[in-house]
Amino acid sequence: MPLPTNQLRLAMVAGEPSGDLLAASLLGGLRERLPESAQYYGIGGQRMIAQGFDSHWQMDKLTVRGYVEALGQIPEILRIRGELKRQLLAERPAAFIGVDAPDFNFNVEQAARDAGIPSIHFVCPSIWAWRGGRIKKIAKSVDHMLCLFPFEPAILDKAGVASTYVGHPLADDIPLEPDTHGARIALGLPADGPVIAVLPGSRRSEIALIGPTFFAAMALMQQREPGVRFVMPAATPALRELLQPLVDAHPQLALTITDGRSQVAMTAADAILVKSGTVTLEAALLKKPMVISYKVPWLTGQIMRRQGYLPYVGLPNILAGRFVVPELLQHFATPEALADATLTQLSDDANRRTLTEVFTEMHLSLRQNTAAKAAEAVVRVLEQRKGRA
């Protein structure tokens, strides 16, 4: 059944950089399948805006980390959410698509669904890892879930939630065999000698909590392995400014800070020390040995620990179903422990070969042409709605 051509409008919300990346991928697929006159609006980042998205609010207004840290931003977030819901109910777009940010989007999706506006959620929350009770909220709020990982649809099906496995766009974008030599040339790094990429996060709170520990670990590694070089991407000038005091405190480090280009920096590396998050999946798709770490405030950590189900937090370990790379979290993330684990990842050739096999299998499983599959799923929802109209 053909879709209407008269000013189709889709509302979308992405709440953080990883969501911006996913939403931009989806927008690219939708623009190929929907009328050229279709409009896309809501809350998004620069990648979405580059796809013709009209962002009515700044995405970083929604970007928070942890329970305690979010308290100060709750009034502003609630104000934005209220305005967005009123706008949706007044304008009645063809669908609302929430991209990740479940604590924000599920409330909006339920309001849309209750008003007869199809609600689609892109990125199934990790109900299989922690806070499994959220599946009840999903069942009330979401008409269709777009899943990044292959084991998620079976979980949702038990709760009566329609879903489509679409894979992960990073698996489509990253080549199966990374060009380490080319990445080193691009960054002006020596072709020979060990290189370790260090990624302490991109938020002020993350840098404050784990940045000093990562830099101390780098100093220890350089003492033990004098020929090692480090590369650290800074996504924005603001992040570089946050890192600068730590750089100044360790002038002896053979450290290259890049302007963005985190994927190039990781490609150039022999091993990676990385804060937990989506970037760990990127590192796995690049077939890199890594050490995963994080630090959050004590109370936030206690809440997360009590509500968790799995013994691991890093996506490579979750997808493998076992520990394939080490995780050093909270008080276990000492400079000495991080240095020991990272140098082991750097030097263990047998482990490197095993990880390459594991990560290649993971890569092939996730490589699904996500933009096309996600866009096709959205179009099917729109067609079904039109068929019922």
Swiss-Prot record:
Catalytic activity reported: a lipid X + a UDP-2-N,3-O-bis[(3R)-3-hydroxyacyl]-alpha-D-glucosamine = a lipid A disaccharide + UDP + H(+)
EC numbers, comma separated: 2.4.1.182
Biological process annotations from GO: lipid A biosynthetic process
GO MF annotations in UniProt: lipid-A-disaccharide synthase activity; phospholipid binding
InterPro entries listed in its UniProt record: Glyco_trans_19
Similarity comment text for this entry: Belongs to the LpxB family.
Name of the protein in question: Lipid-A-disaccharide synthase
Organism: Burkholderia cenocepacia (strain HI2424)
